[in-house]
């Protein structure tokens, strides 16, 4: 699901500066005098003038989503910047992005060959893959089939419609107990940490068929690895854009490689255990489902593209990492918004109380009767835009967009944050208002408005786990709102300023919660 590699702007070391000085004249001449020939009838891409070697990195700053939004107002929805020595096309505006990713989807379906991408999942990552379109499409189809098979897998417990629902409900109930226990012991809790562990457990159940105690060392290590990965990748790596830096010592790169290596070893161990115990008549989880689909492919003589066992590891790695980070970040932001808008929190509780009651746990089948909760989630996705960019795209051939020529193999950034805050698309875009996604009488979800929100990408590279992620956020939220009422700590203001990274997270804080009526334990 959604990531972005944008550089962290800091001062270069002495050795980096020396290398830059040695190459600056040659590279500057190349950048200055080598121009791509523009076909007749098309225009050259507009954009700010880059500096030699570093390009426009000084202009991008620490909040690239805002900087690039400001530049789109100056240059339009299609413009070019230069990060280091690599030209990057930035797309903004809903119509332009939909034209590129849906109507011209094949042209923009590639991934740029960034240096760091080859180290994610040992180069076998589905999300970051630079494989040829046919190979990538076969792997994506396999992953999608495995997800669909598992999400529809029947639960052994008749209370639940499927295994996914069972995993979420059981973990949601345990999360409520954990938060209540923390309140009794400490008087407050860290919403992010508790939610992260619960979501990780759901993902572990889905991918690996196992549930951990919240304090299990293996689970804690997985959570810590994911947080470290987000911090390191979120700050970016200039070596992706200034190739000469690849040959210089880098503490951040060493940490990045170490994190990937440790997680790969964990997933390989799990996949190996699954192969050893695999039973076609007993599909336990997504890993089993992937193995099952791969075995069917091996038996199919008409199948042109086979998927290696190593690439199964990459797919599992992607599904775990993306699903875990997106859902946990979305849920932790949800709790922050509940606290920031207590009147909305109370309205959500009343909707759940009226439609579901307090005697049983909410289920996925209750969703049609909880339109305000769905509207609340959509507004969180839009207002926070905690995934401000998609993973970078890349053009697969020479193409054009809005009358501008874009060469093959051009890196493309999709500014989702701009779309979600575009005043031409939204009334009062910086106001938090879930009602914008309801029908005029407030009784139904306005799905057409909801489709304008962009968080999971679009087109051929759209997140394959989107439906599962949305179901997770919905069900987790319904459960905790039904059981708990969240509050700020007295005298402590709530800081909703996002911290830029792999996904934009709120600052860590302490909150309070009280059990709702009929839920005292």
Curated annotation (Swiss-Prot):
Please list the cofactors this protein needs.
heme
One GO cellular component assignment for this chain's record is: endoplasmic reticulum membrane
Q: Which UniProt keywords apply?
A: Endoplasmic reticulum, Heme, Iron, Membrane, Metal-binding, Microsome, Monooxygenase, Oxidoreductase
The membrane topology term of the UniProt record is: Peripheral membrane protein
PANTHER family cross-referenced by the UniProt entry: CYTOCHROME P450 1A (PTHR24289:SF21), STEROID 17-ALPHA-HYDROXYLASE/17,20 LYASE (PTHR24289)
SUPFAM superfamilies the record matches? Cytochrome P450
Q: Under what name is this protein listed?
A: Cytochrome P450 1A1
Q: Which segments of the protein form a coiled coil according to its record?
A: none
Where along the chain is substrate bound? 229
Alphabetical GO biological process terms: hormone biosynthetic process; progesterone metabolic process
Where does this protein hold heme? 463
The species this protein was found in = Opsanus tau (Oyster toadfish)
Domain of life per record: Eukaryota
Which PROSITE patterns does this UniProt record tie to the protein? CYTOCHROME_P450
Q: Does the keyword Membrane apply?
A: yes
Q: Which reaction does it catalyse?
A: an organic molecule + reduced [NADPH--hemoprotein reductase] + O2 = an alcohol + oxidized [NADPH--hemoprotein reductase] + H2O + H(+)
Regarding protein family, the annotation reads: Belongs to the cytochrome P450 family.
Q: What does this protein do?
A: Cytochromes P450 are a group of heme-thiolate monooxygenases. They oxidize a variety of structurally unrelated compounds, including steroids, fatty acids, and xenobiotics.
- Where does it mainly reside? endoplasmic reticulum
EC number(s) per UniProt? 1.14.14.1
The protein's GO terms of the molecular function aspect are:
heme binding; iron ion binding; steroid 17-alpha-monooxygenase activity
**What Pfam family is a match, any one?**
p450
> Per the record's keyword annotation, is ATP-binding included, yes or no?
no
């Amino acid at each position: 699901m959604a990531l972005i590699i944008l550089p962290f702007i800091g001062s270069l070391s002495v050795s980096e500066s020396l290398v830059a000085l040695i190459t600056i004249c040659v590279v500057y001449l190349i950048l200055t005098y080598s121009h791509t020939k523009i076909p007749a009838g098309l225009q050259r891409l507009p954009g700010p003038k880059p500096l030699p070697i570093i390009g426009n990195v000084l202009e991008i700053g620490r909040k690239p989503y805002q900087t690039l939004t400001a530049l789109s107002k100056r240059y339009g929805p299609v413009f070019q910047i230069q990060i280091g020595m690599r030209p990057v096309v930035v797309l903004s505006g809903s119509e332009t992005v939909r034209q590129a990713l849906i109507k011209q989807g094949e042209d923009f379906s590639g991934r740029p060959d960034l240096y760091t991408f080859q180290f994610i999942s040992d180069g076998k990552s589905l999300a970051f893959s630079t494989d040829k379109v046919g190979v990538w499409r076969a792997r994506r189809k396999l992953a999608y089939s495995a997800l669909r098979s598992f999400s529809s897998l029947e639960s052994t417990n008749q209370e639940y419609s499927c295994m996914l629902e069972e995993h979420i409900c059981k973990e949601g109930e345990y999360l409520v107990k954990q938060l209540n226990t923390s309140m009794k012991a400490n008087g407050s809790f860290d919403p992010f940490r508790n939610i992260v562990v619960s979501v990780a457990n759901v993902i572990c159940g889905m991918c690996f068929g196992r549930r951990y105690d919240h304090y299990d060392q293996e689970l804690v290590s997985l959570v810590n690895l994911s947080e470290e990965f987000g911090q390191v990748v979120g700050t970016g790596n200039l070596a992706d854009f200034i190739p000469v830096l690849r040959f210089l010592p880098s503490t951040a790169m060493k940490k990045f490689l170490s994190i990937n290596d440790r997680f790969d070893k964990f997933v390989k161990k799990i996949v190996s255990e699954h192969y050893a115990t695999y039973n076609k008549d007993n599909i336990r989880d997504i890993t089993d489902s992937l193995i099952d689909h791969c075995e069917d492919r091996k038996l199919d003589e008409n199948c042109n593209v086979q998927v290696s066992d190593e690439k199964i590891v990459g797919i599992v790695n992607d599904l775990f990492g993306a699903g875990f980070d997106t859902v946990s970040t979305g849920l932790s932001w949800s709790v922050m918004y509940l606290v920031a808008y207590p009147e909305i929190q109370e309205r959500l509780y009343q909707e759940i109380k009226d439609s579901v009651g307090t005697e049983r746990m909410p289920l996925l089948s209750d969703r049609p009767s909880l339109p305000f909760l769905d509207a609340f989630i959509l507004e969180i996705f839009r207002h926070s835009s905690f995934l401000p960019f998609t993973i970078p795209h890349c053009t697969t051939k020479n193409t054009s967009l809005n009358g501008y020529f874009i060469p093959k193999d051009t890196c493309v950034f999709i500014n989702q944050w701009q779309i979600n805050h575009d005043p031409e698309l939204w009334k009062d875009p910086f106001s938090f208002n879930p009602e914008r996604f309801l029908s005029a009488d407030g009784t139904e979800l306005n799905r057409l408005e909801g489709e304008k929100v962009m968080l999971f990408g679009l087109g051929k590279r759209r997140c394959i786990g989107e439906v599962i992620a949305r179901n997770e956020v919905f069900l987790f939220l319904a459960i905790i709102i039904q059981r708990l009422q969240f509050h700020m700590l007295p005298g402590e203001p709530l800081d909703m300023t996002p911290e830029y990274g792999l996904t934009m997270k709120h600052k860590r804080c302490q909150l309070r919660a009280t059990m709702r009526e009929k839920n005292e334990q």
